Amino acid sequence: MKYPPEPFRIKTVEAIARTTDWERLAVIQDAGYNVFNIPAEKIYIDLLTDSGTSAMSDNQWAGMMKGDESYAGSKNYFHFETMINKIFGFKHVIPTHQGRVAENLLFSTILKDRKGLVIPNNNHFDTTRANVEYNGGKAEDLVIDIAKDTQAIDDFKGNIDLDKLAHLIDKVGAKNIPIGMLTITNNSGGGQPVSMANIRGTAELLHKHDIPFYIDACRFAENAYFIKTREDGYQEKSILEIANEMFSYADGCTMSAKKDALVNMGG
Protein backbone atom coordinates (compact mmCIF):
# COMPACT_ATOMS: atom_id res chain seq x y z
CA MET A 1 0.00 0.00 0.00
CA LYS A 2 1.35 3.43 -0.95
CA TYR A 3 1.03 6.31 1.49
CA PRO A 4 1.12 9.87 0.08
CA PRO A 5 3.07 12.58 1.92
CA GLU A 6 1.05 14.28 4.66
CA PRO A 7 -0.78 17.39 3.32
CA PHE A 8 0.20 19.59 6.26
CA ARG A 9 3.17 21.20 8.03
CA ILE A 10 3.88 20.76 11.74
CA LYS A 11 4.53 24.22 13.19
CA THR A 12 4.75 23.45 16.90
CA VAL A 13 6.57 20.73 18.80
CA GLU A 14 6.47 19.75 22.46
CA ALA A 15 9.67 18.66 24.19
CA ILE A 16 9.64 15.28 25.93
CA ALA A 17 12.18 14.59 28.67
CA ARG A 18 14.26 11.44 28.38
CA THR A 19 15.14 9.45 31.49
CA THR A 20 17.84 6.91 32.30
CA ASP A 21 17.26 3.37 33.54
CA TRP A 22 18.11 4.41 37.09
CA GLU A 23 15.82 7.44 36.95
CA ARG A 24 12.93 5.28 35.77
CA LEU A 25 13.59 2.77 38.54
CA ALA A 26 13.50 5.55 41.13
CA VAL A 27 10.29 6.96 39.66
CA ILE A 28 8.44 3.62 39.70
CA GLN A 29 9.62 2.92 43.25
CA ASP A 30 8.45 6.36 44.42
CA ALA A 31 5.09 5.60 42.77
CA GLY A 32 4.74 2.41 44.79
CA TYR A 33 4.90 0.45 41.53
CA ASN A 34 1.52 1.93 40.57
CA VAL A 35 1.87 3.40 37.08
CA PHE A 36 -1.10 5.70 37.69
CA ASN A 37 0.97 7.47 40.36
CA ILE A 38 3.79 8.32 37.95
CA PRO A 39 3.92 12.04 37.00
CA ALA A 40 3.07 12.42 33.30
CA GLU A 41 6.23 14.43 32.63
CA LYS A 42 8.25 11.34 33.57
CA ILE A 43 6.59 9.25 30.84
CA TYR A 44 8.53 9.14 27.58
CA ILE A 45 6.14 6.89 25.62
CA ASP A 46 2.50 7.16 26.75
CA LEU A 47 0.51 4.06 25.77
CA LEU A 48 -2.46 4.93 27.99
CA THR A 49 -3.75 8.32 26.88
CA ASP A 50 -5.99 7.68 23.89
CA SER A 51 -7.43 11.09 23.09
CA GLY A 52 -7.07 14.84 23.32
CA THR A 53 -3.44 14.68 22.24
CA SER A 54 -3.66 15.18 18.47
CA ALA A 55 -2.17 18.26 16.88
CA MET A 56 -4.78 20.86 15.93
CA SER A 57 -4.76 22.80 12.69
CA ASP A 58 -3.97 26.49 12.31
CA ASN A 59 -7.66 27.09 11.55
CA GLN A 60 -8.68 25.32 14.76
CA TRP A 61 -6.35 27.43 16.89
CA ALA A 62 -7.47 30.59 15.09
CA GLY A 63 -11.07 29.58 15.71
CA MET A 64 -10.40 29.45 19.46
CA MET A 65 -9.18 33.04 19.36
CA LYS A 66 -12.34 34.07 17.47
CA GLY A 67 -14.63 32.10 19.76
CA ASP A 68 -17.97 33.64 20.69
CA GLU A 69 -18.26 33.48 24.49
CA SER A 70 -21.86 34.70 24.58
CA TYR A 71 -23.85 33.04 27.36
CA ALA A 72 -26.65 32.27 24.90
CA GLY A 73 -26.97 32.33 21.13
CA SER A 74 -23.25 31.76 20.52
CA LYS A 75 -22.40 31.54 16.82
CA ASN A 76 -20.00 28.71 17.64
CA TYR A 77 -22.85 26.64 19.04
CA PHE A 78 -24.84 27.06 15.85
CA HIS A 79 -21.81 26.02 13.79
CA PHE A 80 -21.38 23.00 16.08
CA GLU A 81 -25.06 22.13 15.72
CA THR A 82 -24.86 22.40 11.93
CA MET A 83 -21.90 20.02 11.73
CA ILE A 84 -23.52 17.50 14.08
CA ASN A 85 -26.63 17.52 11.92
CA LYS A 86 -24.57 17.11 8.74
CA ILE A 87 -22.66 14.09 10.03
CA PHE A 88 -25.02 12.43 12.49
CA GLY A 89 -28.42 13.72 11.43
CA PHE A 90 -29.65 14.45 14.96
CA LYS A 91 -31.75 17.54 15.60
CA HIS A 92 -31.13 17.99 19.33
CA VAL A 93 -27.54 18.61 20.45
CA ILE A 94 -26.11 19.08 23.96
CA PRO A 95 -22.42 20.09 23.96
CA THR A 96 -20.26 18.80 26.81
CA HIS A 97 -16.61 19.20 27.70
CA GLN A 98 -15.92 15.50 27.09
CA GLY A 99 -17.64 12.19 26.46
CA ARG A 100 -17.96 10.91 30.02
CA VAL A 101 -20.09 13.94 30.88
CA ALA A 102 -22.42 13.16 27.99
CA GLU A 103 -22.66 9.61 29.31
CA ASN A 104 -23.56 10.82 32.79
CA LEU A 105 -26.23 13.15 31.40
CA LEU A 106 -27.74 10.24 29.48
CA PHE A 107 -27.64 7.58 32.18
CA SER A 108 -28.59 9.84 35.09
CA THR A 109 -31.70 10.69 33.06
CA ILE A 110 -32.81 7.28 31.80
CA LEU A 111 -31.89 5.41 35.00
CA LYS A 112 -33.25 7.97 37.47
CA ASP A 113 -35.37 6.23 40.13
CA ARG A 114 -35.20 3.01 38.07
CA LYS A 115 -32.42 0.96 39.65
CA GLY A 116 -31.36 -2.41 38.28
CA LEU A 117 -32.09 -1.74 34.61
CA VAL A 118 -29.79 -3.35 32.04
CA ILE A 119 -27.77 -1.58 29.32
CA PRO A 120 -26.42 -3.99 26.65
CA ASN A 121 -23.42 -3.08 24.51
CA ASN A 122 -20.77 -4.82 22.43
CA ASN A 123 -18.26 -3.66 25.05
CA HIS A 124 -18.76 -0.75 27.41
CA PHE A 125 -15.81 1.61 27.64
CA ASP A 126 -14.67 2.00 31.25
CA THR A 127 -16.26 5.44 31.74
CA THR A 128 -19.48 4.20 30.14
CA ARG A 129 -19.63 1.25 32.52
CA ALA A 130 -18.83 3.51 35.46
CA ASN A 131 -21.63 5.93 34.54
CA VAL A 132 -24.14 3.10 34.05
CA GLU A 133 -23.30 1.46 37.37
CA TYR A 134 -22.97 4.74 39.32
CA ASN A 135 -26.51 5.57 38.26
CA GLY A 136 -27.84 2.19 39.37
CA GLY A 137 -27.83 0.26 36.11
CA LYS A 138 -26.15 -2.97 35.04
CA ALA A 139 -23.75 -2.92 32.07
CA GLU A 140 -23.80 -6.07 29.92
CA ASP A 141 -21.04 -6.80 27.38
CA LEU A 142 -22.23 -8.96 24.47
CA VAL A 143 -19.34 -8.85 21.99
CA ILE A 144 -18.93 -11.80 19.61
CA ASP A 145 -16.80 -14.63 20.99
CA ILE A 146 -14.07 -14.35 18.33
CA ALA A 147 -13.25 -10.89 19.69
CA LYS A 148 -11.69 -12.54 22.73
CA ASP A 149 -9.28 -14.59 20.60
CA THR A 150 -6.27 -12.37 19.95
CA GLN A 151 -4.93 -14.77 17.31
CA ALA A 152 -8.13 -14.96 15.27
CA ILE A 153 -8.50 -12.87 12.13
CA ASP A 154 -11.88 -11.29 11.40
CA ASP A 155 -12.83 -8.08 9.62
CA PHE A 156 -15.27 -6.93 12.31
CA LYS A 157 -14.26 -8.28 15.72
CA GLY A 158 -16.08 -5.39 17.40
CA ASN A 159 -19.55 -6.70 16.49
CA ILE A 160 -22.19 -7.38 19.11
CA ASP A 161 -23.52 -10.95 19.21
CA LEU A 162 -27.13 -10.57 18.08
CA ASP A 163 -28.10 -13.99 19.46
CA LYS A 164 -26.79 -12.97 22.89
CA LEU A 165 -28.68 -9.69 22.62
CA ALA A 166 -31.91 -11.48 21.72
CA HIS A 167 -31.40 -13.89 24.64
CA LEU A 168 -30.80 -10.99 27.04
CA ILE A 169 -34.00 -9.26 25.93
CA ASP A 170 -35.96 -12.48 26.47
CA LYS A 171 -34.29 -13.07 29.84
CA VAL A 172 -34.72 -9.65 31.49
CA GLY A 173 -37.60 -8.27 29.43
CA ALA A 174 -37.62 -5.28 27.10
CA LYS A 175 -39.16 -3.08 29.81
CA ASN A 176 -35.94 -3.49 31.83
CA ILE A 177 -33.70 -2.32 28.97
CA PRO A 178 -34.10 1.46 28.59
CA ILE A 179 -31.61 1.61 25.69
CA GLY A 180 -29.23 -0.66 23.81
CA MET A 181 -25.81 0.55 22.68
CA LEU A 182 -22.94 -0.08 20.30
CA THR A 183 -19.47 1.39 20.79
CA ILE A 184 -17.80 2.19 17.46
CA THR A 185 -15.06 1.33 17.17
CA ASN A 186 -15.08 -1.13 20.08
CA ASN A 187 -12.60 0.66 22.35
CA SER A 188 -12.46 -1.85 25.20
CA GLY A 189 -12.40 -4.64 22.63
CA GLY A 190 -9.08 -3.56 21.15
CA GLY A 191 -10.47 -0.80 18.96
CA GLN A 192 -12.04 -3.35 16.62
CA PRO A 193 -14.65 -2.09 14.11
CA VAL A 194 -18.35 -2.86 13.87
CA SER A 195 -19.88 -3.71 10.48
CA MET A 196 -22.78 -1.84 8.94
CA ALA A 197 -24.73 -5.09 8.83
CA ASN A 198 -24.23 -5.49 12.59
CA ILE A 199 -25.27 -1.89 13.27
CA ARG A 200 -28.38 -2.38 11.16
CA GLY A 201 -29.17 -5.74 12.76
CA THR A 202 -28.77 -4.32 16.26
CA ALA A 203 -31.14 -1.46 15.46
CA GLU A 204 -33.73 -3.81 13.96
CA LEU A 205 -33.64 -6.15 16.96
CA LEU A 206 -33.87 -3.37 19.53
CA HIS A 207 -36.59 -1.49 17.66
CA LYS A 208 -38.58 -4.72 17.30
CA HIS A 209 -38.90 -4.60 21.09
CA ASP A 210 -39.38 -0.79 21.22
CA ILE A 211 -35.94 -0.30 22.78
CA PRO A 212 -34.11 2.89 21.69
CA PHE A 213 -30.72 2.37 20.05
CA TYR A 214 -27.77 4.61 20.98
CA ILE A 215 -24.22 4.69 19.64
CA ASP A 216 -21.05 5.58 21.52
CA ALA A 217 -19.59 7.44 18.56
CA CYS A 218 -16.08 8.33 19.70
CA ARG A 219 -14.35 6.76 16.70
CA PHE A 220 -17.15 6.86 14.15
CA ALA A 221 -14.88 8.06 11.31
CA GLU A 222 -12.38 5.26 11.86
CA ASN A 223 -15.24 2.76 11.96
CA ALA A 224 -16.61 4.22 8.71
CA TYR A 225 -13.17 3.80 7.13
CA PHE A 226 -13.07 0.12 8.11
CA ILE A 227 -16.54 -0.37 6.64
CA LYS A 228 -15.40 1.32 3.42
CA THR A 229 -12.32 -0.89 3.10
CA ARG A 230 -13.70 -4.20 4.43
CA GLU A 231 -17.46 -4.47 3.87
CA ASP A 232 -18.96 -5.30 0.49
CA GLY A 233 -20.93 -2.51 -1.15
CA TYR A 234 -19.21 0.42 0.53
CA GLN A 235 -15.95 0.81 -1.41
CA GLU A 236 -17.38 3.56 -3.61
CA LYS A 237 -19.10 5.45 -0.80
CA SER A 238 -17.53 8.41 1.00
CA ILE A 239 -16.78 8.36 4.72
CA LEU A 240 -19.53 10.96 5.23
CA GLU A 241 -22.07 8.82 3.35
CA ILE A 242 -21.15 5.80 5.46
CA ALA A 243 -21.36 7.83 8.67
CA ASN A 244 -24.77 9.15 7.62
CA GLU A 245 -26.02 5.59 7.16
CA MET A 246 -24.54 4.36 10.44
CA PHE A 247 -26.36 7.00 12.45
CA SER A 248 -29.57 6.75 10.45
CA TYR A 249 -30.20 3.52 12.36
CA ALA A 250 -29.68 5.13 15.78
CA ASP A 251 -32.01 7.14 17.99
CA GLY A 252 -29.17 9.08 19.57
CA CYS A 253 -25.50 8.99 20.48
CA THR A 254 -22.87 10.13 22.93
CA MET A 255 -19.39 11.12 21.84
CA SER A 256 -16.05 12.29 23.08
CA ALA A 257 -14.90 14.78 20.46
CA LYS A 258 -11.32 14.27 21.68
CA LYS A 259 -10.98 11.27 19.37
CA ASP A 260 -12.10 11.47 15.75
CA ALA A 261 -12.98 15.18 15.90
CA LEU A 262 -9.24 15.75 16.49
CA VAL A 263 -9.58 18.39 19.20
CA ASN A 264 -8.20 18.57 22.73
CA MET A 265 -11.54 18.96 24.50
CA GLY A 266 -15.25 18.56 23.81
CA GLY A 267 -18.10 16.13 23.41
Task: Describe the predicted segments one by one.
Residues 63-65:
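Short, contiguous pre-domain boundary segments
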